[in-house]
Amino acid sequence: RDWLLLIGGSTYKFTLTGFYLVALVAILKNHGYSLNQLSWIHLIGGIEAAKVLFAALMERRPAGRFGRFRGWLLAATLGLSAVFGLMACTDITQNFPLLLACCVLLSAMSAVYGCAMLGLSCIVLPHRERGFGGVIQTMAARGGKMIGGALVLWLYQEYGQTAAAGFMLAFSLLMLLQLLCYREPDSPTAQGSWTALAARLVSFWWRPETGWRWLVLLFAVAA
């Protein structure tokens, strides 16, 4: 059940990415949106950069009745389901302010979902299995981007905007059902202040097995 949730959750996360960055932009372009308007969509997508803050908040929040990360996953999936439900019932392409509001929610909830799923994978997978877990997540990322980008666009081309949004809604509800049936294992609450967290982040790159050269490599790959 743990592996099933990690595979499904990782696929869903990158399906959201493919939908937002590929399908949604292509659909809006087809509706006559200008490059200036589309730039706002990508700018709002920068909310994902706040993941570091979301992750720190999740680590320090005591586990509640839904678990440390499962509660965040449930809340994010509910929010995403509401947005996709609105998209399926309303033509938001004709209302730019409403579209921007939906994009803010999509980006924010997607960031929360991604952080919570990564945190859950860290407490579910033993240290020796995290390498294999990374491979699974990479494969799920490839598949998710194809689903969110290519498949959703095909549905839009063949059956219209309602069908494309309806597919994303159905996928969200399926993940919500999976989360409702899942029970998160116990995990300790992270200790230390925000200052200690910043110190750990800096010291991590001074370790022999990491080092600043790997940080430079990461930035080079990202660029």
Regions found by a protein language model. Give the residues of each.
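Helix-loop boundary and gating motifs at the non-cytosolic
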Residues: R1-E48, W212-A223
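Glycine-rich segments within core transmembrane alpha-helices of 12-TM secondary carriers
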Residues: I47-K51, G131-Y156
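Transmembrane alpha-helix termini and helix-breaking/packing motifs in multi-pass membrane transporters
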Residues: A56-P62, M87-A88, M146-A164
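C-terminal ends and interior cores of transmembrane alpha-helices
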Residues: L73-T93
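Cytoplasmic helix-loop-helix junction between adjacent transmembrane helices
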Residues: L106-A141
